[in-house]
Swiss-Prot record:
PANTHER family: POTASSIUM VOLTAGE-GATED CHANNEL SUBFAMILY E MEMBER 1, 3, POTASSIUM VOLTAGE-GATED CHANNEL SUBFAMILY E MEMBER 3
Mode of membrane association: Single-pass type I membrane protein
Entry-linked Pfam families: ISK_Channel
Compartments, record wording: Cell membrane; Cytoplasm; Perikaryon; Cell projection, Dendrite
Keyword Transport recorded: yes
MF annotations from Gene Ontology: potassium channel activity; potassium channel regulator activity; transmembrane transporter binding; voltage-gated potassium channel activity
Glycosylated residues, chain numbering: N5, N22, N41
Protein name: Potassium voltage-gated channel subfamily E member 3
Assembly and binders: Interacts with KCNB1. Interacts with KCNC2. Associates with KCNC4/Kv3.4. Interacts with KCNQ1; associates with a KCNQ1:KCNE3 stoichiometry of 4:4; produces a current with nearly instantaneous activation with a linear current-voltage relationship and alters membrane raft localization; affects KCNQ1 structure and gating properties.
Region spans: Disordered: 30-52
Positions on the Cytoplasmic side per record topology: 78-103
């Protein structure tokens, strides 16, 4: 008699769930536009002509992304410029640089 480790039942249940999900996604029951009972069932033409609440949401997203890019860019630019500046009061420039050339 074979011993089962439980993966076969798990595989069968996963296969059944995925098959049901695939059937639901490919059915045309969810995406039928048309008049129906209730105020929520409007046709596509009428729904497209109504002003939506989130019509300009993409502009808000672009604005936030632009502000983030400016902030990060200014931080990177400020950091790299601060590292490039040669400070004359740096001990390397005061004591070591001139003496190395003498050796």
């Amino acid at each position: 008699m074979e011993t089962s480790n439980g993966t076969e039942t798990w595989y069968m249940s996963l296969h059944a769930v995925l098959k049901a999900l695939n059937t639901t996604l490919h059915s045309h029951l969810l995406c039928r536009p048309g008049p129906g009972p209730g105020p929520d069932n409007q046709t596509e033409d009428r729904r497209a002509s109504l002003p939506g609440r989130n019509d300009n949401s993409y502009m808000y997203i672009l604005f936030v992304m632009f502000l983030f890019a400016v902030t990060v860019g200014s931080l990177i630019l400020g950091y790299t410029r601060s590292r490039k500046v040669d400070k004359r009061s740096d001990p390397y420039h005061v004591y070591i640089k001139n003496r190395v050339s003498m050796i």
